[in-house]
């Protein structure tokens, strides 16, 4: 039996997704929470990541610098904001760390930076990690091909008041799936 664990760092530890990811990492077999990060100046820096996530003491203090924890993780999971993610991307590329990127709202240059880094490090980059949403994207693609140019397609979305990006990455991915199926930009 192989006991190797993937050591993960969670960027945006104090956010909604960050807290859920910390809980998951602490409960998941084969995964160890190696580090938790928040932006410089955050009042959460120094707090215990497990306690922050409501999972009890984990013995991992929230840090503000990837350099401070570079030997504590193999993969960085990042659901922050484009500017932060791109800074993390440069660090991970330089140090050979994998990334899971759930951040949305990148401009074309940001998306290209991720594609370029993927030549050197392992990266999973998705606007939405839900199986249901990814099935929906495939169905939209098929529907758009069947309906072709004979119809107008509109995407309308609503969110909770804490949503940081609008339109959401999921809505943009839906638009891209439809546009791709119709060979439009």
Curated annotation (Swiss-Prot):
Any one GO BP annotation for this protein: diaminopimelate biosynthetic process
Keyword Cytoplasm: yes
Molecular function terms, GO-annotated: 4-hydroxy-tetrahydrodipicolinate reductase
Reactions listed under catalytic activity: (S)-2,3,4,5-tetrahydrodipicolinate + NAD(+) + H2O = (2S,4S)-4-hydroxy-2,3,4,5-tetrahydrodipicolinate + NADH + H(+); (S)-2,3,4,5-tetrahydrodipicolinate + NADP(+) + H2O = (2S,4S)-4-hydroxy-2,3,4,5-tetrahydrodipicolinate + NADPH + H(+)
EC code: 1.17.1.8
Pfam families, per the entry: DapB_C, DapB_N
Active site per the UniProt annotation: 159 (proton donor/acceptor), 163 (proton donor)
Pathway(s) it belongs to: Amino-acid biosynthesis; L-lysine biosynthesis via DAP pathway; (S)-tetrahydrodipicolinate from L-aspartate: step 4/4
Entry's localization field: Cytoplasm
GO CC term, one of those recorded: cytosol
Positions contributing to NAD(+) binding: 12-17, 38, 102-104, 126-129
UniProt-listed Gene3D superfamilies: Dihydrodipicolinate Reductase, domain 2, NAD(P)-binding Rossmann-like Domain
Protein residues bound to (S)-2,3,4,5-tetrahydrodipicolinate: 160, 169-170
Keyword terms, alphabetized: Amino-acid biosynthesis, Cytoplasm, Diaminopimelate biosynthesis, Lysine biosynthesis, NAD, NADP, Oxidoreductase
InterPro entries hit by this protein: DapB_C, DapB_N, DapB_N_CS, DHDPR_bac, NAD(P)-bd_dom_sf
Binding of NADP(+), residues: 39
Homology family: Belongs to the DapB family.
PANTHER family given in the database record: 4-HYDROXY-TETRAHYDRODIPICOLINATE REDUCTASE 1, CHLOROPLASTIC-RELATED, DIHYDRODIPICOLINATE REDUCTASE
Subunit-structure text: Homotetramer.
Record function comment: Catalyzes the conversion of 4-hydroxy-tetrahydrodipicolinate (HTPA) to tetrahydrodipicolinate.
Protein's name in the database: 4-hydroxy-tetrahydrodipicolinate reductase
Organism this protein belongs to: Klebsiella pneumoniae
Gene name tied to this protein: dapB
């Amino acid at each position: 039996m192989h006991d190797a664990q993937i050591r993960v760092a969670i960027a945006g530890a104090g956010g909604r997704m960050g807290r859920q990811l910390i809980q998951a990492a602490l409960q998941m077999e084969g995964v160890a929470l190696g580090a938790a990060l928040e932006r410089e100046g955050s009042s959460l820096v120094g707090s215990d990541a497990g306690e922050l996530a409501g999972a009890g003491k984990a013995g991992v203090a929230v840090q503000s610098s990837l350099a401070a924890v570079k030997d504590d993780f193999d993969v960085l999971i990042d659901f922050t904001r484009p500017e932060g993610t791109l800074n993390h991307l440069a660090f991970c590329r330089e140090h050979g760390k994998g990334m899971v990127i759930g951040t949305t709202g990148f401009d074309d240059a940001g998306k290209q930076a991720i594609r370029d880094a993927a030549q050197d490090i392992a990266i999973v980059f998705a606007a939405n990690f839900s199986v249901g949403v990814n099935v929906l994207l495939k169905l939209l693609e098929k529907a758009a091909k069947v309906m072709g140019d004979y119809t107008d397609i509109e995407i309308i979305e609503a969110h909770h008041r804490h949503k940081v990006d609008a339109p959401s990455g999921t809505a943009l991915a839906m638009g891209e799936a439809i546009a791709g199926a119709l060979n439009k930009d």
